[in-house]
Amino acid sequence: MNSIEFPLFHRTTQNSVISTTLNDLSNWSRLSSLWPLLYGTSCCFIEFASLIGSRFDFDRYGLVPRSSPRQADLILTAGTVTMKMAPSLVRLYEQMPEPKYVIAMGACTITGGMFSTDSYSTVRGVDKLIPVDVYLPGCPPKPEAIIDAITKLRKKISREIYPDRILSQRENRCFTTNHKFQVGHSIHTGNYDQGFLYQPPSTSEIPPETFFKYKSSVSSHELVN
């Protein structure tokens, strides 16, 4: 029995069928639709807000800002992170669905910035709390640099393998130690706590025999001509 051939059918299928893997298809769909959660605490966030305007138009990159971490796959930290804010940041990151990404924007987020030298409450780098995918230095970085960081993150997503990423997050994640502070009384109210101040005993409270005994024990110095 002769087989029927469809030359037109074979020619169209050869030009339209694409062979790929499920991992590459997943990466391609995610890199074009990043939904960021904006975690801005200082002036760096103002630079990111300028991307919303028509000059840069970050909608063309598929960015859709979300207000809930459960709907976001990218968190962008911009500004100083303090010890008091650290638990909230970690909680937001843990509420994001997998796979999730982090962009650390600005010197204050990456290293603590100018507050890292003499501040007791500043986190010296947000990577001590959550894993960071892209570091964006600057004080503050320009909007063009933010677009470049997003482009680099898209390239990273297109090359990654999801099981390897989960394993890397489990091995390379680190946390800061818990800082314990002791709350004292304020000295700006005028009511000073006597326990924090040292007051030497007055001479009226010292017995006379003790005072003269100490005075006689001190040797006198003679002047030699």
Curated annotation (Swiss-Prot):
[4Fe-4S] cluster binds at C43, C44, C108, C139. The keyword Translocase applies. It comes from the Eukaryota. One of its GO terms (biological process) is electron transport coupled proton transport. It catalyses: a plastoquinone + NADH + (n+1) H(+)(in) = a plastoquinol + NAD(+) + n H(+)(out); a plastoquinone + NADPH + (n+1) H(+)(in) = a plastoquinol + NADP(+) + n H(+)(out). Binds 1 [4Fe-4S] cluster. Its EC number is 7.1.1.-. Signal peptide: none annotated. It is found in: Plastid, Chloroplast thylakoid membrane. Its main location: plastid. Its cofactor is [4Fe-4S] cluster. The keyword Signal does not apply. Keywords: 4Fe-4S, Chloroplast, Iron, Iron-sulfur, Membrane, Metal-binding, NAD, NADP, Plastid, Plastoquinone, Quinone, Thylakoid, Translocase, Transport. InterPro entries: NADH_UbQ_OxRdtase-like_20kDa, NADH_UQ_OxRdtase_20Kd_su. It is a peripheral membrane protein. NDH is composed of at least 16 different subunits, 5 of which are encoded in the nucleus. NDH shuttles electrons from NAD(P)H:plastoquinone, via FMN and iron-sulfur (Fe-S) centers, to quinones in the photosynthetic chain and possibly in a chloroplast respiratory chain. The immediate electron acceptor for the enzyme in this species is believed to be plastoquinone. Couples the redox reaction to proton translocation, and thus conserves the redox energy in a proton gradient. This is NAD(P)H-quinone oxidoreductase subunit K, chloroplastic.
